């Protein structure tokens, strides 16, 4: 299911970040902060009235030719473009300014639902001025106070009322859906084109559930694939690539719809901090992952160099020790033949089910090899385990006391399950539960 997106927009100093933090911290329950961007507090994944959605905090929209103002305006325009609903925030202590009118013109052009929030209405007497905000032309304005958290419930009720129909995407169970993520200029579009040119069996370009997204069908090795949101890579181009904070949103949407995520790394420039953040999105979403080192033609690409590079990847991406690493060049097509088998293997692992009796044989053998830990004289007893979900494979281990399950022992059991059943390219989730 695609999450709706809410952008908070307005001129500088109307309290956008205060409202964002108030919504994130108190008035709505945060499901999780989207990983890797917590420093900037640009995005949050949130829930209100059983609707899960993304909130975006934008920079202030301000006229001017200074590079910083142009960049902030450009970023806000991208957020508006991605949003399903826009919260237009104003400063109730200052009334409607000419700068607010300029923002309103921009929002009218978007043809998106706009909900007006008049911030800094800290006492009821100020509410008498609320009617002047009808003149903006967006319907009922909502008096709110970011400082005191007043009026936000009514505002959010209105916001979620504008969300598009959250119907489940119909996916063909026999088709593998995959996306490509990576920092700018890592070669995402080149790799898509290499896959398509090599195959030359594009059935059709199909509309994705995400607005403006084009998905591309592909058939290879007796398997149907869908490459998710190729439009995001092939059409949006430099504006999205240059404003990384906001282009991340499209990657998050693609990840949500994927079975397998290809995390692209540039062999020429090596591993960067941004690579880790991007990979973290896919890992935290529980998707199958293949690490793809592109531009392998630009470096000393012998077997020894490959092993050294993979060793470096393992050191930087310790939480992705399950992900296979594929080395290739989209430009020269070198080693392209290794990619599709890796995607298929990761997808198979992601959907694999293990019979309960076979699983418990492995668990009991593992315990015999490495006895369960004790805490304050009390020993952990593992009674039995069962698989409860796929995508990713998830297991519940029933025990006498979950508090006795140390992280290191949980990781030991997880690794034994992974090794025994060949889970490659997928995270595994293990939960200790007290037997009722």
Swiss-Prot record:
Domain named EngA-type G: residues: 4-167, 176-351
Membrane spanning stretches: none
Pfam families: KH_dom-like (PF14714), MMR_HSR1 (PF01926)
GO molecular function terms listed in the Swiss-Prot or TrEMBL record: GTP binding; ribosome binding
SUPFAM superfamilies recorded: P-loop containing nucleoside triphosphate hydrolases
Keyword annotations of the record: GTP-binding, Nucleotide-binding, Repeat, Ribosome biogenesis
Residues annotated for GTP 2 binding in this entry: 182-189, 229-233, 294-297
GO biological process, one term: ribosome biogenesis
Claim: GTP-binding is one of the keywords in the record: yes
Residues that coordinate or bind GTP 1: 10-17, 57-61, 119-122
InterPro entries noted in UniProt: G_ENGA (IPR031166), GTP-bd (IPR006073), GTPase_Der (IPR016484), KH_dom-like (IPR032859), KH_dom-like_a/b (IPR015946), P-loop_NTPase (IPR027417), Small_GTP-bd (IPR005225)
Subunit record text: Associates with the 50S ribosomal subunit.
Family listed: Belongs to the TRAFAC class TrmE-Era-EngA-EngB-Septin-like GTPase superfamily. EngA (Der) GTPase family.
Role summary: GTPase that plays an essential role in the late steps of ribosome biogenesis.
Name the record gives this protein: GTPase Der
Source species: Oceanobacillus iheyensis (strain DSM 14371 / CIP 107618 / JCM 11309 / KCTC 3954 / HTE831)
